[in-house]
Every structure is written in C-alpha cells, then in structure tokens.
Amino acid sequence: MASTSLGASILVSHCSSAPEFQVSGMRLVFGYKAFGCRTSRRGFRVRCESKIQEKELRRCSPFLERLSLPREAALSSNEWKSVPDIWRSSVEKYGDRVAVVDPYHDPPSTFTYRQLEQEILDFVEGLRVVGVKADEKIALFADNSCRWLVADQGIMATGAVNVVRGSRSSVEELLQIYCHSESVALVVDNPEFFNRIAESFSYKAAPKFVILLWGEKSSLVTAGRHTPVYSYNEIKKFGQERRAKFARSNDSGKYEYEYIDPDDIATIMYTSGTTGNPKGVMLTHQNLLHQIRNLSDFVPAEAGERFLSMLPSWHAYERACEYFIFTCGVEQKYTSIRFLKDDLKRYQPHYLISVPLVYETLYSGIQKQISASSPARKFLALTLIKVSLAYTEMKRVYEGLCLTKNQKPPMYIVSLVDWLWARVVAFFLWPLHMLAEKLVHRKIRSSIGITKAGVSGGGSLPMHVDKFFEAIGVNVQNGYGLTETSPVVSARRLRCNVLGSVGHPIKDTEFKIVDHETGTVLPPGSKGIVKVRGPPVMKGYYKNPLATKQVIDDDGWFNTGDMGWITPQHSTGRSRSCGGVIVLEGRAKDTIVLSTGENVEPLEIEEAAMRSNLIQQIVVIGQDQRRLGAIVIPNKEAAEGAAKQKISPVDSEVNELSKETITSMVYEELRKWTSQCSFQVGPVLIVDEPFTIDNGLMTPTMKIRRDKVVDQYKNEIERLYK
C-alpha cells in the first residue's frame, strides 16, 4: 500500500531550450516546431508529464515506537493499541530492572527492560529491511528463550502476524501449518532444526527468507539453496543501521504511518488438542491486551519478583502470562523440565507458571523422598502431614470454602453448629499443625523453592495434589482457559482459593452451563457444557468459517467442549464464600459410553489411580465395551521395590519382574485407589513406552492425547477385550 503526493512543474520549451514552472500537481511542457521547409508556419506543442512521489506505508506500534516517529505521527496518549506497546510503559517504570535471564543458551543472556526494548526495536527495523510487510504471515518455529520473545514482539510490531509452533513438532505438522497459514518467511530456533526441515520446505513451501535465532549459518547443510538465510545478529545489525540513519537524517518523513488496530490479528496459534486436526486460532491484539490488563486481579505480581518459565513460550497460556508479568516489572528466568528441579532451589522464584502435571510430579517426588527415609522419619512425616490435611479441611469448613452442588442453602442453626464444630476441631489440631510446619513443611517448601504461589493452567489439578500443597503451605492457583479464549477466562484468587475449582471468571467475561443435548441453560449446581462470552474469545479459526460457526454462536457464546458447573450462591454454610466459582469435570468428548448405555467420565478414575506410586501414566478406555479397561505405564522402579518386600529372599535375586506380575500388582493398586469411584476398571494393558511430546502421545502442555493413544494400541485393545 502507498499514498501518493503530487509535486509537479510547468516546462516551456522552444526548440532545444525551455523554462520550467513548478505548479502543484503536474509538470506541463510547452514547445513549438517547424512542420516542413516549404512553410514558415510553426506548430505549438504541449506535453503533460506527471511526477509522482511515493510514500511507503509503515504499520507500527505507536506507543512502542513513539520516540522514533515524526512529531505529527506520534501517539499523544499512553493508551496501548497493540501488544508491543507495553514495552514503552515498562521501560518508563522499570527501565534498569532485570527483565529476563536466559542462562541455558549460547551465549547466556540477561536484559534489563531498557535493553530488551532496544533489542525489540532493532529487530523490528531489521525485519522491515529484509522486506517484512504489514499483514504478512511469518512462521515462528522455536522454543522458549529471550530471542523468541524479541522475535515474537518484533513481528507483531511491524503489523505482521506471527504463526507459532515449537521445534519439537513433526516436519509434516510444521509444513501443514506453514502452508495453511500462507506464511511467507520462517524464523527458526537454530541451524540443527532448520537442517531437519529444510528439504521438505524447499520443495513444497520455499520461504522468501529464513532467520536463525541461535547458532551460526556455518552450521547449515543447505548451502547452494536460493533462500536467503540471516542470523539473529544480522537482523539486529540491519535494524541498528536503519535506526541510526533515521536519527541522522529526516528519512522517517518519507513514510506514511499507520497505527496497528487493536482488532488486527496479532498471532495465529494452531491448537494441538487431545483430539482432531489442529486449527488456526486467530487472536487479536485486543484479545491479548485484555489478558494483560486483567490478570493482575488473580496474580498480584510486584516489581522485582522472580518468575520461573518452563512452558513453551508459543503456547497461549505461557504467552499471556509472560506479556502480563512484563507490565509488572518482574524478573523472568527461562528454564526447562531438565533444569526445573535445580532452578527451583537455586532461583527460589516467587511464582512458577506451569501445568498440573508439573505439580503432580513435584508431589510424587516429595512422596518418594519421604518413602526413602528411615521408618521412624517416614512415620512421623506422614502422620504430621495427615494432621495438617485434617486441619486445613476444618479451616475450609469454617471459612466457607467447600464446594457444593446443593442449590438450597442449609438452615442457619445447622450452619452455626457446623461452623462451631470445625472451629473446635481446628483449635485442637492447630498445635500439631504448627509442629508439622516446623519439622516437615518448611523443609518441603525449601526443597520446592516456590516462595509465593504456583500458578497452574491447562487443566484441573487432581484434588489430592491440591489438598497436599495447601496442607504444607504452598499456594497453588488454578486457572482455566483455551487457546480460543486467549486463554485465561477464570482463575482462583489467593484470597478465595477454592480447592477443586478453577475460580471466578475474569473481568467482563460471562459463563453459562447448558444441557449437552438440548442447549437449555442450566441452574447453578447442574453439570453441563461450559460456554464463555467476552473480550478473550478469539476472532475465529483461520480460513475455516464453518468450524468457527460450530463453536461460536450468533450471540458470541463460545462452546468450550468442557463439562462443568457453577457453584450456587449461599449466604450460610460451608460454601458461603465460594458462590459463582467454576468447577470442571472433564471434556465432553472424553466421556466413555459403555455398551450398556452408561456414561463414564474417565478423569475421576485416572486422578484416583495416579495416587498410586506404581502407576506412572494411565488412560481409561472402554468405548462401546461392556466394561472399562485401562492402558497403564507402570513405574517399574517402584514396582520392583514393592515386589521385593513381598517375595522370598531366594526370589529377590530376580532382577526383572514379568509383565504378568506387574499387571497383577497394577490391578491391585487400581482396585485399592479407585474403590470409591463410580466405576471400576476391568482389563489392564501394560505398555513400556511412556506417553511423551516427542512420540506425539502428549500435547505441548503435557496432556495425554487419548485418540492417539487408543489408535496406537488399537490391536492390543481388541485382544484385551476378547
């Protein structure tokens, strides 16, 4: 796009010479000549020429780039129009505070807010130099790092749209995303990753250029190809030179400036999903700015506090949290699953942003440490933890933080007696709870390292994990959302941390529960499909209006596909303080329908089973069968330890347990831990290969992909039910 200004002149010519007259709009050329030697008659010639000066259109983040814009183009207010605008505000408030620490890349990096803003501005201008235009799609296939953040914000600030994915995805998936999104260029993690995908991309979707965030071009094995490849530092250098030129001259006046509109698409994120093919979710700047402005109601982060980041930066949950915390002046350190345990101890973060599986892993690690201690220490620790669990249970009762589906509140006298009873029991348990705090809980908290709160998203926390962390004094705030909702639509507040729930709705966001079959709105306490409406809801699925229409109705309600209910409002009783919180009970698509016609929610059984030390992972199966079954990844180390306690000294020399023995032990554990569930598990399939992101059986947020698991073990499942 370009705007046109006319700077014109009048040129009068007679034979070989002619004066010029400048007139706004065009250039006129006047002249005369002889028509032949036999006549003295002269002809008068007029020629009209148009001289057009082009002004290149520059889409920009007006607040981020305010200092480099011409005075007439600069934004006068401090209102954010786009996500990158947050950096100017943060620099003005927290300029010399440390913003990010990235210790595990080469070179290790630390940036203050001021340095990070300059890094982003250099990258923005460098992208413009290599030809990035507004509204173009740029694929950003990389994992979390400070340079990912710079590239993400740089692409957005040009008015382009970034299409994000991690480097651990398959080549086929990345190629599908690149082609479907109509991306024109590629930003990748490192040379090794590009070498892996280069051949497929060069034949099917050749990008106009490639940028390497880390590493050197000398490591590429694609020499001779026509696609230009730039290093991160080259793009930065291009940007620095262009910005320096602007500062020395009036080159910035050659451009027509246009602000990024809040309703412009900022990013396209392809959902991993536990079922089905990925769809491109279009999130606008306004979607993400709503998250940034309102997450402080749930996470009261303060300047100087430390956050530990280990989730993929390209995931909606991690992105929204990162954007938000950088408006608070916090210090973020990038880590990974490999270094998480050590970094928690070394870094002692105020907050850890993660998913339920990480908290389950921390819980399992603590239980394992306790089990490995001497019998006396083990007995003391487990006893004191049980006392603390009982104490916090009573505390929730008298504070009114217990969930209930009952729509009718209890009578006042019943509530009063209940409150008094909980107070009395808590009073007598308090000294033992304080003893547990001194002897056990402080040591556990010190080993975990989280000093203020753990923030969990991407799924519900298992209740036993939730209760355990509350008992030992670690605040865990669970939130809820989907990629399609930017993602956070509800979260638990520290002052109203209702266990088993995902908290209250975020500001300006509405919830309703509808009947799965009729679509009728259900009253509080009734279970149904969760629907959401408000500013976080996506613009739609890219190039897929039919899929968009299937999930967003004419009134703007988004069908989450999750099952849940809203707690009733009570003025008395155990639930008086938790009215209006959202409780999830699995995915509608996860529901197993037995051949008897009974509907089973597998999540209840799986959460109960995961309390066993012998079970590492589990997927409950049984669609269209007479009874439930399970695919189990056993914890072989724990199984061998348990077996040695049961078998004779002669047999204890056996190094490896048979599959039949492990199956029998797992089945006993399932009967023990799921005895209180509505349904019991029948046949069990033991498999050796864990479900991981790399083998495609888990999503990037570490949720098991049920459809993939069932498909992979289809033949074994058939034999299991014969």
From Swiss-Prot:
GO terms for molecular function: ligase activity. Coiled coil: none annotated. May be involved in the activation of fatty acids to acyl-carrier-protein. Belongs to the ATP-dependent AMP-binding enzyme family. The keyword Lipid metabolism applies. InterPro entries: AMP-bd_C_sf, AMP-binding, AMP-binding_CS, AMP-dep_synth/lig_dom, ANL_N_sf, Chloroplast_AMP-bd_Enzymes. Keywords: Chloroplast, Fatty acid metabolism, Ligase, Lipid metabolism, Plastid, Transit peptide. It comes from Arabidopsis thaliana. One of its GO terms (cellular component) is chloroplast envelope. Its EC number is 6.2.1.-. It holds the Pfam family AMP-binding_C_3. This is Probable acyl-activating enzyme 16, chloroplastic. GO terms for biological process: fatty acid biosynthetic process. The keyword Ligase applies. Residues 1-47 form a transit peptide.
